[in-house]
Amino acid sequence: MNSKLKSIYLGQAIGDALGLATEFMSKEEITIHYPNGIKDYNDIYQDEHRSRWSKGSWTDDTDQFLCIDRSIKKYGHISTLDIAQEFKNWFNDNPMGIGKTTYEILKLPRKKIFHIRNLLIIY
């Protein structure tokens, strides 16, 4: 892997792990919990949501990035069908932190997901 590509992967994972610090917080909550900013993983406020992850762990955002990456490496181009299958495989492993909308779509049977996809393409 070349250094630029490696930097993209590291930036995604590190940024995601640090971004967990403010995920789902309002501006007011961020000001209260991080008056001096966030300098490292030890600064991350541990509430019910954030304490589910080990310090420095990435979230479902990076997991989904890696699903897309695997698909592109496999086919050499973007295949929405394969990316959907990668997401479904990832979902079947019961990932932590999955968003409500993503969860609601991925819990559907494969046939229904592709029906929705086809409707979106048509309209």
For each of these PLM feature ranges, what is it?
Residues M1-Y123:
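Structured, active/binding-site neighborhoods that engage oxygen-rich ligands
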